[in-house]
């Protein structure tokens, strides 16, 4: 009994240290963003909100937020649809080249981002769409679709195959069975895939930096601000981007219009 209690406390302490290690940099970044001094110093200078005001009044930041929101929501929609289609194909059908099919579907996350970004840049330049928002959406969809596929495929593996067969026996065609049986069963995985792919797209930097052109996203504009200087504006912008929910951004953009 004593050994179990000791092990439990050890695991709790280890978990607490892991969370401290993960969240401490974020916490100190938020603290220093309220510092009036340009450089992070201890003890802190006077309390100020001017860095947040600078970010709020910067039109480039809001343009980047608009671009990031558009890209992330579009990417999440496309990636989730592709992920559902590929997951259902893997679940429903058996064919000779299925291992190759799955290998190609799951390949993008295994490729280094720099290599993928350079390949995407060359491909988009050849197609004549380099630097457009559409190119960012396509690149992010290729990167994130495998994550959606993995989540939805895991959910499909928990479904009884006889459910779909029962729908067919009751007169439903394939599309009706898909709409009334498969999609409702996969709804939690679809929602999870949408949220995950949107978050990955919103935070993705390497590919965005190569293919975005003048359509900068939040990670790209943060790099531009931080390059060559250390500014509390960057820390306030990072903290603000973490707190900006899609609802808040939508309301802000609608008010501007």
Outline where the language-model segments fall.
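Single conserved hydrophobic/aromatic residue that forms the stacking wall/gate
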Residues: 238-257
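Transmembrane alpha-helix signature in integral membrane proteins
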Residues: 59-90
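N-terminal, non-cleaved signal-anchor transmembrane helix
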Residues: 1-59, 63-66, 70
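Transmembrane alpha-helices
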Residues: 13-14, 19-26, 135, 142, ...
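Membrane-interfacial helix termini and adjacent extracytoplasmic/periplasmic loops
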Residues: 40, 44, 49, 98, ...
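Interhelical loop and adjacent transmembrane-helix boundary motif
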Residues: 2-7, 37-39, 52-60, 202-241
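Short hydrophobic faces within alpha-helices
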Residues: 65, 90, 107, 162-170, ...
């Amino acid at each position: 009994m004593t050994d179990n209690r000791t092990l439990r406390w050890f695991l709790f302490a280890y978990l607490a240290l892991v969370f401290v290690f993960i969240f401490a940099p974020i916490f100190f970044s938020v603290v220093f963003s309220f510092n009036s001094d340009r450089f992070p110093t201890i003890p802190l200078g006077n309390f100020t909100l001017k860095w947040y005001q600078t970010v709020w009044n910067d039109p480039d930041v809001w343009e980047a937020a608009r671009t990031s929101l558009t890209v992330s929501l579009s990417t999440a929609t496309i990636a989730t649809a592709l992920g559902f289609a590929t997951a259902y194909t893997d679940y429903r059908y058996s064919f000779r080249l299925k291992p190759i099919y799955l290998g190609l579907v799951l390949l993008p996350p295994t490729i280094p981002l720099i290599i993928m970004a350079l390949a995407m840049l060359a491909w988009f330049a050849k197609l004549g769409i380099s630097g457009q928002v559409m190119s960012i959406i396509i690149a992010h969809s290729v990167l994130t679709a495998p994550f959606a596929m993995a989540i939805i495929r895991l959910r499909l593996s928990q479904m009884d195959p006889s459910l779909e067969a029962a729908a067919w026996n009751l007169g439903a065609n394939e599309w009706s069975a898909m709409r009334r049986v498969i999609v409702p069963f996969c709804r939690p995985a679809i929602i999870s895939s949408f949220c995950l792919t949107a978050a990955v797209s919103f935070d993705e930097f390497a590919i965005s930096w190569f293919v975005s052109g003048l359509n900068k996203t939040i990670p790209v504009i943060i790099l531009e601000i931080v390059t060559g200087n250390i500014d509390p504006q960057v820390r306030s912008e990072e903290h603000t981007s973490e707190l900006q929910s899609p609802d808040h951004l939508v309301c802000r953009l609608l008010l501007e219009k």
